[in-house]
């Protein structure tokens, strides 16, 4: 039995284990992270060059072909360490969810929900 498990581990690509690691970490980060108030969760991408998405808040989980550029707006939902869980909505309505490094994001001071406290 041990030889069989060793053979499977040898034949499985390392990406399979990385994907499982990233999936577990993303779930944990969503559960343990700090949630944003939807009245103040819209950010713009700042800096220069591409801001890559990650499938989880870890360098090992980079999505090399998924990125946004300066000026794009993101909706932040959870903060975990150096990352925000975000959604990007493209001009044609496609949505991309994932994690980005928060140091490239610039606050806009508005959100996707009305702030009823300021309307009193």
Where do the model's predicted regions map?
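Core beta-strand residues in small-molecule sensory/regulatory alpha/beta domains
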Residues: 48, 52-56
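Boundary regions of SH3-family modules and the immediately adjacent low-complexity/disordered segments
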Residues: 19-41, 63, 87-120
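Short loop/turn positions at the edges of beta-strands in beta-sheet-rich folds
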Residues: 78-80, 92
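Short aromatic-glycine-enriched beta-strand elements
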Residues: 81-85
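Sec-dependent N-terminal signal peptides
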Residues: 4-13
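Sec/Tat signal peptide C-region and signal peptidase I cleavage site
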Residues: 14-18
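SH3/SH3-like (including bacterial SH3b) beta-barrel domains
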Residues: 55-70, 76-78
């Amino acid at each position: 039995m041990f030889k069989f498990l060793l053979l499977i581990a040898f034949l499985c690509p390392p990406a399979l284990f990385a994907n499982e690691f990233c999936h577990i970490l993303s779930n944990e980060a969503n559960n343990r992270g700090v949630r944003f108030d939807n009245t103040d969760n819209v950010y713009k991408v700042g800096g220069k060059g591409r801001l890559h998405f990650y499938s989880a808040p870890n360098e090992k989980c980079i999505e090399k072909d998924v990125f946004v550029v300066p000026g794009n707006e993101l909706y932040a939902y959870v903060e975990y360490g150096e990352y925000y869980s975000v959604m990007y909505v493209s001009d044609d309505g496609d949505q991309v969810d994932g994690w980005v490094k928060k140091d490239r994001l610039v606050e806009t001071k508005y959100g996707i929900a009305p702030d009823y406290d300021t309307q009193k």
